[in-house]
């Protein structure tokens, strides 16, 4: 397994399993299989409605929590909910999240980011980041943040390489993480 060190010193696996569009039963089965196959990064989100299943899968895997890199995302409707992160921890049945992202730059995402900073300072979250943000939106976060974001998760694949965005992230000490890294499973790309 390869790792990358984030700007706060946390080591993140470079590969893992995402649970987008998986039903809870599918997510639980897929995560257990992935963990048994050596994958250690699990990506989920409030909006995927399968966080409880991911939590069950982590327990069923037999792995220690420290062996798993758990990543989830805070949905915009929860940005102002003072206990949103505690509710996320409860759904996942865990004491901490390795990487928590703002899912989208919608609504009051600054309030959401502030909540994540608080959770980071309290030790509930090991790293915080962003998802689906453009450069202008990230600049707004950089102008207010006390804790620098570590990761931007966004659509990146051979058909959408984002060289300007990658250069911006590198200059700011952030890592890019791809969703749909195989281009939506495009047959021409895969073959």
What spans do the regions from the language model cover?
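Acidic-and-aromatic substrate-binding clefts and catalytic sites of carbohydrate-active enzymes
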Residues: 22-25, 45-53, 75-80, 105-109, ...
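Acidic (Asp/Glu)-rich catalytic clusters
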Residues: 7, 33-36, 55-67, 86-95, ...
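Beta/alpha (TIM)-barrel catalytic core signal, keyed to glycine-rich beta->alpha loops juxtaposed to Asp/Glu
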Residues: 104-191
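N-terminal binding-site loop/beta-alpha segment at the start of enzyme catalytic domains
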Residues: 1-68, 182-183
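Conserved, mostly hydrophobic/aromatic
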Residues: 17, 34, 42, 54, ...
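A structural motif
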Residues: 39, 94-97, 125, 149
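Short, acidic/polar
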Residues: 22-35, 78-93, 111, 135-140, ...
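Glycine/small-residue-rich loop that forms an oxyanion/phosphate-binding "nest" at active or ligand-binding sites
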Residues: 72-118
């Amino acid at each position: 397994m390869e790792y990358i060190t984030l700007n706060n010193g946390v080591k993140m696996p470079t590969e893992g399993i995402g649970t987008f569009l998986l039903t809870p039963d599918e997510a639980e089965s897929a995560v257990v299989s992935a963990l048994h196959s050596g994958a250690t990064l699990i990506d989920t989100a409030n909006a995927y409605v399968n966080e409880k299943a991911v939590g069950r899968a982590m327990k069923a895997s037999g792995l220690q929590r420290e062996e798993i890199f758990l990543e989830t995302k805070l949905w915009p409707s929860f940005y102002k909910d003072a206990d949103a992160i505690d509710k996320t921890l409860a759904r996942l049945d865990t004491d901490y999240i390795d990487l928590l992202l703002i899912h989208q730059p919608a609504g009051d995402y600054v309030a959401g980011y502030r909540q994540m900073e608080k959770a980071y300072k309290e030790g509930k979250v090991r790293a915080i980041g962003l998802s689906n943000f453009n450069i202008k939106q990230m600049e707004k976060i950089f102008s207010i943040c006390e804790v620098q974001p570590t990761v931007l998760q966004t659509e990146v694949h051979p058909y959408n390489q984002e060289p300007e965005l990658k250069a911006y992230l590198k200059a700011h000490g952030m890592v890019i993480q791809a969703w749909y890294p195989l281009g939506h499973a495009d047959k021409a790309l895969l073959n």
